[in-house]
Design a protein with these regions (language model features):
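Regulatory and interdomain segments flanking nucleotide-handling catalytic cores
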Residues: 1-161
């Protein structure tokens, strides 16, 4: 039973510590991030490697390698990213989140989600802009109307191949 003067935060940390697990220090840690339902997400994309998807995954991996402490190697294939982390570059090197598995997994997944969404959005927007500039501007009235609409609304477009 918690004492009356315990703060809510301290009690919650106590509950969390029961299931807290740590990796062994001074050993490489491998994090594998796998896309959820990417078979549905990639429906309609070029097989086997859509250039927009590939570029977004590479950009995501690069972001993770640059922003996760101790990351020495990143590898991406399909909808998976593998990262190798070390905490033995020097004797004073600390492990990312003290090798707390729950923290490493949850934060790396959220970082990957953020980076992928930003990269995919930017790369898709660039592709859409390229398509708009290839769209014929001369010709029928309908063609001109479609072009005008796309140019004015291009921030709301999404590559739905």
């Amino acid at each position: 039973m918690a004492k009356k003067n315990d703060s809510l935060g301290n009690r919650m940390k106590g509950y969390e510590s029961v299931s807290r697990h740590f990796l062994t220090r001074r050993m490489p840690a491998i994090i594998r991030l796998d896309g959820k339902a990417f078979h549905t997400f990639t429906k309609g994309m070029k097989k086997p490697f859509d250039p927009i998807m590939t570029q977004a995954m590479q950009s995501t991996m690069k972001y993770l390698c640059e922003n996760i402490q101790g990351c020495v190697l990143g590898y991406t294939q399909s909808d998976e990213i593998t990262l190798v982390l070390t905490d033995y570059a020097t004797l004073q090197t600390d492990a990312w989140f003290g090798n707390n598995i729950q923290k490493m997994v949850s934060v790396s997944a959220s970082m990957a989600t953020l980076a992928f969404n930003q990269a995919f959005s930017a790369i898709s927007a660039e592709w859409i802009n390229q398509q708009i500039h290839q769209f014929p501007t001369m010709g029928t009235e309908t063609t001109r109307e479609v072009h005008t609409y796309i140019v004015k609304r291009n921030t709301a477009l999404f590559d739905s191949r």
